[in-house]
Regions:
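Alpha-helical, largely C-terminal catalytic domains
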Residues: 1-165
Length: 165
């Protein structure tokens, strides 16, 4: 991985939930209640970030923070004009693994986000702190990846089941 990709992945993982500092976390079952709701929530989050967080930031890193928090779970690059372009993991590795493309493994950030939620739920359940919602959340994460599905080179199903067993 090029140096910029490593840096971008780190900061994307670190800042991807920044909008929730203002909007609060909306749990996935609520966000996924309708097909349109995730886009509506994302639009509101972006508006609030621009209104309440951006004015508090130094100008020199505002655009990078927006890059890290926008479309955070998509693999993406910036083209020669600075436009964000979604690309496959294969393209990230074969064509865009150079600093000049500002590459980000957004799907890897998503896996890490799910993994941390799974571990939090699983550890709580194993220590007797549980509820039907926590169990359903844990199970939902386990079932969200197919057995033979590989995301950004990772068999997430196997990873998740290895963690909880």
């Amino acid at each position: 991985m090029c140096e910029r990709r490593i840096i971008n992945n780190f900061f994307s993982a670190l800042f991807h939930d920044l909008p929730e500092a203002v909007t609060r976390d909306i749990i996935s079952p609520v966000k996924q209640a309708t097909d349109d709701l995730p886009n509506i929530v994302k639009k509101i989050e972006n508006e609030i970030v621009n209104k309440e967080l951006v004015p508090l930031m130094e100008d020199f890193f505002v655009q990078e923070i927006i890059d890290f928090t926008s479309d955070e779970f998509s693999n993406r690059i910036k083209d020669a004009n600075g436009n964000v372009v979604n690309v496959s993991w294969e393209e990230l590795n074969e064509k865009y693994n150079e600093d000049k493309f500002f590459p980000i493994d957004g799907k890897l950030v998503r896996i890490a986000d799910h993994l941390s939620a799974l571990m939090e739920a699983d550890i709580s359940i194993k220590h007797g702190i549980t509820s039907i919602h926590l169990q359903n959340g844990r199970d939902g994460l386990l079932y969200s990846y197919k057995e033979d599905e590989v995301v950004n080179g990772i068999n997430v199903y196997n990873l998740f089941y290895d963690i909880v067993s």
